[in-house]
Regions:
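Short, glycine/charged-enriched hinge/interface segments at domain edges or termini
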Residues: 3-72, 90
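Generic structural hydrophobic/aromatic packing signal, biased to beta-strands
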Residues: 51, 139, 163, 185-186
Length: 191
């Protein structure tokens, strides 16, 4: 097993075969996810104005790729600012390492995540990047705690893009995995 590798079943087989009982590994992070918005639902049959809670399933599946512990915090409604603030205070003293929210991070009336996050002692804070899809994204670390918060956009494609380009590299860095380098290609139209 090499450094910066995620242990798989074949590694376990080799270690047990060789009689190796203890190896040094990184702690498995605990990730708590919240969806936000009055329009978000987990129901099968939905009215036209509702949106299926697809972001939680997407984030859960991506987090499970790392074998991290995923906890679904449920759906926070548009007026759940105080509920969210109380949950954050409680989380600060829990085993949760990373909080990820989906929605409520832009500049609208019900976009409460940035307002609540500002109330805490933060470092490495940003709230917007120049990419589309995915412009409204929040990242913060709580000073004195090993906890990070990502506020992703509510739009599923924007949320997936921000997860891929911001959360995913952060998770890799927690494990000590080197970031993937990308090849840049110029595309040409051919019709």
């Amino acid at each position: 097993v090499y450094k910066r590798q995620i242990l798989q079943s074949n590694h376990i087989l080799a270690l047990k075969t060789l009689g190796i009982k203890n190896i040094k590994v990184k702690k498995i992070p605990n990730i708590l996810f919240f969806s936000t918005g009055k329009e978000i639902t987990n129901q099968e049959n939905i009215p036209n104005w509702k949106v299926r809670n697809s972001n939680s399933y997407y984030i859960k599946s991506k987090v499970k790729n790392f074998l991290f512990n995923f906890f679904d915090g449920g759906i926070l409604r548009d007026r759940d600012e105080l509920v969210f603030e109380k949950k954050i205070k409680k989380i600060l003293h829990s085993k949760i390492d990373i909080i990820i929210t989906s929605g409520a991070v832009s500049a609208g009336k019900f976009d409460f995540v940035p307002r609540i996050i500002k109330k805490f002692n933060l470092s490495n804070h940003f709230k917007s990047v120049a990419i589309r899809p995915g412009k409204p994204i929040l990242f913060a670390k709580i000073k004195g705690k090993q906890k990070a918060i990502f506020g992703l956009p509510g739009n599923p494609i924007s949320s997936a893009a921000c997860f891929r380009f911001f959360v995913y590299p952060y998770l890799e860095s927690l494990l000590g995995i080197e970031a993937v380098s990308y090849t840049h290609l110029r595309a040409h139209e051919t019709y």
